[in-house]
Swiss-Prot record:
NCBIfam families: mutl, PRK00095.2-1. It comes from Microcystis aeruginosa (strain NIES-843 / IAM M-2473). One of its GO terms (biological process) is mismatch repair. HAMAP family: DNA_mis_repair (MF_00149). CDD domains: HATPase_MutL-MLH-PMS-like (cd16926), MutL_Trans (cd00782). Gene3D superfamilies: 3.30.230.10, Histidine kinase-like ATPase, C-terminal domain, MutL, C-terminal domain, dimerisation subdomain, MutL, C-terminal domain, regulatory subdomain. PANTHER family: DNA MISMATCH REPAIR PROTEIN MLH, PMS, MUTL (PTHR10073), DNA MISMATCH REPAIR PROTEIN MLH1 (PTHR10073:SF12). This is DNA mismatch repair protein MutL.
Length: 550
């Protein structure tokens, strides 16, 4: 049951961090949408007339009574908290009771609302947030808030605002974030009374994300939910939706989003954990698609630190970083329980159509049910392993699959071993020498501008090109870069003939890696062809009589 609106006592007001001043069209949208979500709305309509500085937000939430309408625009009036202790167990998006009061100070504000079986009421508020006379109007249960002439009495503030296009882009991002955090809501947004943005509801964020990123398809995603217990013995959940790195990546980190308890937040520490988990799975200078939503006990979070409640202090930060990395590792695996089985990849359909026209085999994408069921059956051009599976077949490029295996072994154990005979390198610069020493190699002077390398990564010890490999390692990069270079040089070369046993061993090792989808450079390792796709290509659903023209 919703509490009535009341003005907070002074001892609670004194503890509340200063609320954010209404400083843009987006700030108005944010405050009104938060109120709508807190009211339990599952349909929100927004109408923006940016040139007229007008915004209207309508919802089908619980609505307000006549008494609430008379109090809602006073400073620190709220139904969401009552006392000091409530500040440490906040479950709503808003709690300070300042939104409507702040808006009334800089715009013309009117609110129409209806609660339960009450009659709908309409009220206009002055710039102090004081209500005028209430009028009865016919309205469905819910609330309609109209804000007009925003900053009309503050022309200097209007002139200092970003361009209208920039403000609209910020509003679009804001609505995207709300939609991801609250997927059950239907969104309809108008600009100057024209359709601008529509988002249909979904069971979770994986059904919302493809509506927001046009280049993203449902089958490009993996999602999972993990229930866990925090170090404080509290129940919590990680909800994760990621773009599979062998299918989708971005030029910038614009779709790495983090939410906590229904609110999008900024956290450089959690973002760093996400980037660490995706390291060496996406190509260089590319970024992952990732939506992370933490559902925590409200006592684990302090929302009362930032005016927009966008920055938080999270208890047990190191624990959460470790759990996030672990969850992403799990989602990046080949376990198909985190991959939708029924959704047909649009790109696969296009490939199948083209293949049928050209009478050639086609390639689709789908993960197996059991990573242990791949069986090596052949090798193509001494480059690709053909692996049979109960649901079709896979093509695996042998070099980059082996590279992934070796890279993860080097990550776990960067082993440097002594050389029986030192390798002599000439003309090394001081920077190259320091780089090899940083990697743990033993180096000694060996005459004029020559150096004796007395140790080497174990994978390179028996290679004939180990001197070239050492020169490559000396040219820079961190330890991870050196591990990638070593794995690449040491992996089975394309053009190498493999026996069935060798191919099977490689498949088994590769399937057990943490990130089997891409090589350390971000290239996809495998392609799959489903038996159902083969059946469609060969028209196996035809009736025998029809196929003979009977």
């Amino acid at each position: 049951m919703t509490l009535p609106i009341q003005v907070l006592p002074q001892d609670v007001i004194d503890l509340i961090a200063a609320g954010e001043v209404i400083d843009s069209l987006g700030a108005v949208v944010r405050e009104l949408v938060e109120n709508a979500i807190d009211a339990g709305a599952d349909r929100i309509t927004i109408d923006i007339s940016p040139q007229n500085w007008r915004i209207q937000v309508s919802d089908n939430g619980r609505g307000m009574s006549r008494e609430d309408l008379q109090l809602c625009s006073y400073a620190h009036s709220t139904s969401k908290i009552r006392q000091r202790d409530d500040l440490w167990q906040i479950t709503s998006l808003g709690f300070r009771g300042e939104a409507l009061h702040s808006i009334a100070q800089v715009a013309h504000l009117r609110v129409a609302s209806r609660h339960d079986d009450d009659l709908g009421c309409y009220c206009l508020y002055n710039h102090q947030g004081e209500p005028g006379n209430l009028e009865t109007i016919p309205i469905a249960i819910g609330t309609i808030v109209t804000v007009e002439n925003l900053f009309g009495n503050f022309p200097v503030r209007r002139q200092a605002l970003p361009s209208i296009n920039k403000q609209l882009k910020d509003i679009q991002t804001l609505i995207h974030n709300f939609a991801l955090c609250h997927p059950q809501i239907t969104w309809q947004v108008f600009q100057d009374h024209q359709d601008w943005l529509r988002i249909s509801p979904g069971k979770d964020a994986s059904q919302i994300l493809p509506q927001l990123v046009k280049s993203l398809h449902f089958n490009d995603l993996a999602s999972l939910k993990l229930d866990l217990t925090t170090p404080d013995a509290e129940s919590a959940q990680i909800e994760l939706v990621i773009g599979l790195p062998d299918r989708i990546s971005r030029h910038q980190p614009d779709w790495v989003r983090i939410a906590v308890n229904g609110r999008m937040v900024r956290s450089s520490e959690l973002e760093q954990a996400i980037f660490e988990a995706f390291a060496r799975t996406v190509p260089k200078d590319r970024y992952p698609v990732c939506f992370l939503h933490l559902h925590l006990n409200p006592r684990s979070i302090d929302w009362n630190r930032h005016p927009a409640k966008a920055e938080i202090y999270l208890h047990n930060l190191i624990f959460w970083q470790e759990q996030i990395i672990s969850a992403i590792d799990k989602a990046l695996g080949l376990n198909p329980e985190h991959i939708p089985e029924k959704a047909q990849n649009q790109r696969v359909s296009q490939i199948l159509k083209a293949a049928e026209e050209k009478s050639t085999y086609t390639i689709g994408e789908k993960s197996p049910k059991n990573r242990l069921e791949l069986k090596a059956v052949a090798q193509i051009h001494q480059t690709y392993i053909v692996a049979e599976h109960p649901h079709g077949l896979w093509l695996v490029e042998q070099h980059i699959a082996h590279e992934r295996v070796l890279y993860e072994r080097l990550e776990d154990n960067w082993e440097i071993v002594p050389l029986d005979t030192p390798i002599i390198l000439n003309q090394l610069t001081t920077r190259q020498i320091e780089q090899l020493q940083r990697l743990g190699l033993e180096i000694a002077s060996f005459g004029d501008r020559s150096w004796a390398i007395r140790s080497i990564p174990v994978l390179l010890k028996e290679r004939e090109d180990r001197a070239d490999a050492l020169l490559e390692l000396s040219l820079g990069g961190d330890l991870q870069t050196a591990q990638v270079a070593t794995a690449c040089r040491s992996a089975i070369r394309n053009g190498t003939a493999l026996s069935l046993k060798e191919m099977q061993n490689l498949l088994d090792d590769w399937q057990n890696t943490r990130n089997p989808r891409t090589c350390p450079h971000g290239r996809p390792i495998y392609l799959s062809l489903e038996e159902t796709s083969l059946a469609r290509f060969f028209r196996r659903h035809w009736v025998i009589g029809k196929s003979h023209g009977i």
